[in-house]
Every structure is written in structure tokens, then in C-alpha cells.
């Protein structure tokens, strides 16, 4: 999942000199070099489950690592040719875009919502990631354009339709990878706010403050009916259906087109807050939408749509979910010991190379989902998680888990901790048109 639409800690502001409106492409929205302030040293500043700073050079290095991984794995042929990624700036969405572009030479259009840099304040990591990807893709001779804005709105959808029609003709892959705290419904104008809560009864379990390294119990009160409905409205499948209907009605889906959205199921220890909680109910609605979209695409040139259930990873979204960071820290230690650990780019490359393309046929579970969480859910791994879980304390956290690996991956999301980057050097926080 990717925080591709407005976030609670990144509340969008009115248009500034640096952002000429949400409906502008990133190239038009980039700051004027003449307005560039002084260079600055950028350090990570962690506030709870987020980092409020991002390093442009580090983000670019992280993107390049992912590109290098895909290129080293060799071409994915046949693969997608023209791809729309909705939620393209971080996490699984960005990894999907990189895999399509550098694995299959695909033309890509990315939709995202990020905050550009301001006076004395770096941009969000997704802003820097997108610029780095766009620069690398164009240097490789690949088509890469971007639209910055709220993907839930009709205006952004229409702008995407216009750009696809004029530049791409049709798309043969649509990746839907949004995770958001709120959605203004385009028909009713109602603002729905999602929440991460159990349903029915309070939930108590262990969690970890990943910054301080403190393990403690947390109790989360259950959601009420309105909160459940709001979370489904934000994180469910309605917007995915709206995107696909708009593309279909505009005749912008190529015959045989594929669409995929991402989900997570996980082990029983996380079910109360995830699978059986508000977010899980929203994911159930995403699966409902997948079935509807699949039926429509099958009647439109034998296309297909489905959910890919992915591995638990450190992302901007997962770090906000109670209990999950402790589970991920345990999981990382166990899977690294087995040599089966994967990050976002490894997951998406395996999805594309073994399930979607490369002459392969998807393998579905009983629910019609592709499972690239299969290595995570191996019985021996989950048995080991269950054995370790009760014994983890603040005192033995570093011994029992890979909290160091969790922290490293967390900081990399924001461009920190990358090899070869001088974090003691002053850096230009803005990225102007000359950078792409």
C-alpha cells in the first residue's frame, strides 16, 4: 500500500508558488529555480510513526536501488506496454511502476498526491521519488508522465483520461495502490475519514514504539458503525470501480487489459486490527470491486482484474497500524534467517515475473486472489512467530526481533541511511525542472 492521497500529517495546503494546483502535472508544479532558498543539511526527524523530513539525494538513491534490482533480474517479456499507476509515488505503487518500466520497457503514467518543498522545509519522499523515477525513465528513453492531485476526484480522473487519450492511446495495465486517511466523495461531497480499529469488541495486544524501542500493551476501542462505513468508503473498492468505469467508457482500456489492487491478510495475531477490523472490511469491499471489474474486463477483450495479497513490509501505511510493526520486526528476523525476506521491489518483481507476465498464468487461492505473501505465510515461519511473540519485551527486543532492520527500512522510506549519500553535506531541498 502507498499514502498516495492526502494524509493526516500532510494536509494539503492552498496552491503556492511551488504547486500550481492539484491538477497540474509534476513537471508544471515544480518550483521555479529563481525562488530556491539556501541549501540545507537535512536530518531525519521522527514523530511517532512518521518522519517529517525527507532527503532528496537519499530518495533518489533508493529509487535507483530499485531500478538496479529490476534491471539485474532481466527483462519481463511479454510484459505490460502502457501502464497507469494510481498511487505511484511510494511503496508498492512505486515498485510496480519501476518494475513495469525497467522490467518491460513500459510507458507509465503515475497519479500521486505529495507536498513539494517549501521555504526551509523538504518535500515529502514521494515527491522526490517521482522526480527521480521520471528522470531515470526518460534517460532510458521511456515515456513517463505524472499527475499530482487527489485521485478520488473527478477532475484528476478526467485529466488522466485526457493524457492517456492524447499520449498513450490505451492502457493495458492499471495498478490501483491507494491508502488514504480521508476521501471527499465526488458525488455527495461528504468527507469520509478512515480509521484503524477493531470491530465489535476492544482489542488488546503487544505493540512497539519503533523509535524508542519500548514494548507495551495497547488497547484499541472498537469502531462504531459510522466509522466502519467511512473506512469502507475511503479504502474500499468504489473508487477503483470509478477509475475503471471511466477508462472503459472513454475506450481507453486495451483489449485484454489487466488491473490489480493490493491487499494484506496476515496471521491471526494481526487479524483483530487488520483482517477483521475496519481496514479488513474495506479490503473485503475491494475484493467485491475486483470481481465486478474482472467480469467487465472479461467481456472487454478477455481482460482480467484481481487482488494481489502482498507481504507485510515497512511502508508509510503499515507503520501507522498498532501491533503490526512488532509483528514485522519478528517476521524480518525469521525470514532473513531463512533467506526468504523480500522488500517492495522484490515482491512486485516476483508478482510481475511469475504471476502477471513473462508467459505465466496467475495462481489464485480459493478467494480468487494472487498470493505473493506465500513465503511469509509458510507454516514454519508462522509457527516461529507464534513462539517468539509472547516472550518479546523491551529488554530483549533487539535479540528477539529485527528492530534494527525495521528502523533501517523505515528511514529509507524517507531517503535516510542509503549507502553513498553524504548526510553531513548541505543539499538543495528543491528539485527544479532541470532535475528531470
Put a short name on every predicted segment.
Residues 78-111:
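Canonical Rossmann dinucleotide-binding motif of NAD(H)/NADP(H)-dependent dehydrogenases/reductases
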Residues 105-143:
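Glycine-rich phosphate-binding loop and adjoining beta1-alpha1-beta2 segment
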Residues 61-80:
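A short, basic/flexible loop-to-alpha-helix module at the beginning of a structural domain
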Residues 196-303, 309, 314-332:
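Catalytic loop of short-chain dehydrogenase/reductase
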Residues 148-160:
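The beta1-alpha1 cofactor-binding region of Rossmann-like NAD(H)/NADP(H)-dependent oxidoreductases
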Residues 159-188:
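A glycine-rich helix->loop->beta "capping" turn
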Residues 37-64, 138, 269-436:
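NAD(P)H-dependent oxidoreductase Rossmann-fold/reductase module
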Amino acid at each position: 500500500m502507498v499514502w498516495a492521497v492526502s494524509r493526516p500529517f500532510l494536509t494539503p495546503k492552498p496552491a503556492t508558488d511551488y504547486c500550481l494546483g492539484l491538477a497540474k502535472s509534476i513537471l508544471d508544479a515544480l518550483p521555479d529555480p529563481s525562488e530556491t532558498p539556501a541549501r540545507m543539511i537535512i536530518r531525519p526527524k521522527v514523530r511517532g510513526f512518521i518522519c517529517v523530513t525527507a532527503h532528496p539525494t537519499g530518495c533518489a538513491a533508493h529509487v535507483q536501488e530499485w531500478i538496479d534490482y529490476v534491471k539485474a533480474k532481466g527483462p519481463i517479456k511479454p510484459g505490460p506496454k502502457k501502464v497507469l499507476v494510481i498511487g505511484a509515488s511510494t511503496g508498492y505503487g512505486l515498485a510496480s511502476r519501476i518494475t513495469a518500466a525497467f522490467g518491460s520497457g513500459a510507458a507509465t503514467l503515475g497519479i500521486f498526491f505529495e507536498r513539494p518543498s517549501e521555504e526551509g522545509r523538504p518535500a515529502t519522499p514521494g515527491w522526490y521519488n517521482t522526480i527521480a523515477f521520471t528522470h531515470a525513465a526518460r534517460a532510458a528513453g521511456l515515456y513517463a508522465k505524472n499527475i499530482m492531485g487527489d485521485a478520488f476526484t473527478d477532475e484528476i480522473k478526467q485529466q488522466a483520461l485526457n493524457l492517456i487519450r492524447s499520449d498513450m492511446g490505451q492502457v493495458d495495465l492499471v495498478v490501483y495502490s491507494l491508502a488514504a486517511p480521508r476521501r471527499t466523495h465526488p458525488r455527495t461531497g461528504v468527507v469520509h475519514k478512515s480509521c484503524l480499529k477493531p470491530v465489535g469488541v476492544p482489542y488488546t495486544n503487544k505493540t512497539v514504539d519503533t523509535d524508542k524501542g519500548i514494548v507495551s500493551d495497547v488497547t484499541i476501542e472498537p469502531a462504531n458503525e459510522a466509522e466502519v462505513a467511512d473506512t469502507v468508503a475511503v479504502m474500499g473498492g468504489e473508487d477503483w470501480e470509478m477509475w475503471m468505469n471511466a477508462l472503459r467508457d472513454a475506450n481507453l482500456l486495451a483489449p485484454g487489459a489487466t488491473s490489480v489492487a493490493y491487499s494484506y491478510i496476515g496471521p491471526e495475531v494481526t487479524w483483530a486490527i487488520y483482517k477483521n477490523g475496519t481496514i479488513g472490511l474495506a479490503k473485503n469491499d475491494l475484493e467485491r470491486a475486483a470481481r465486478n471489474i474482472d467480469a467487465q474486463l472479461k467481456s472487454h477483450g478477455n481482460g482480467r482484474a484481481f487482488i494481489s495479497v502482498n507481504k507485510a513490509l515497512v511502508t508509510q501505511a503499515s507503520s501507522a497500524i498498532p501491533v503490526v510493526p512488532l509483528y514485522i520486526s519478528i517476521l524480518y528476523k525469521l525470514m532473513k534467517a531463512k533467506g526468504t525476506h523480500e522488500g517492495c521491489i522484490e515482491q512486485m518483481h516476483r508478482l510481475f515475473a511469475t504471476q502477471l507476465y513473462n508467459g505465466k498464468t496467475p495462481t489464485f487461492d480459493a478467494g480468487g486472489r494472487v498470493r505473493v505473501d506465500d513465503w511469509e505465510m509458510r507454516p514454519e515461519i508462522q509457527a516461529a512467530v507464534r513462539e517468539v511473540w509472547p516472550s518479546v519485551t523491551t529488554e530483549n527486543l533487539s535479540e528477539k526481533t529485527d528492530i534494527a532492520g525495521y528502523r533501517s527500512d523505515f528511514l529509507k522510506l524517507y531517503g535516510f541511511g542509503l549507502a553513498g549519500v553524504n548526510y553531513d553535506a548541505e543539499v538543495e531541498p528543491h528539485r527544479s525542472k532541470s532535475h528531470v
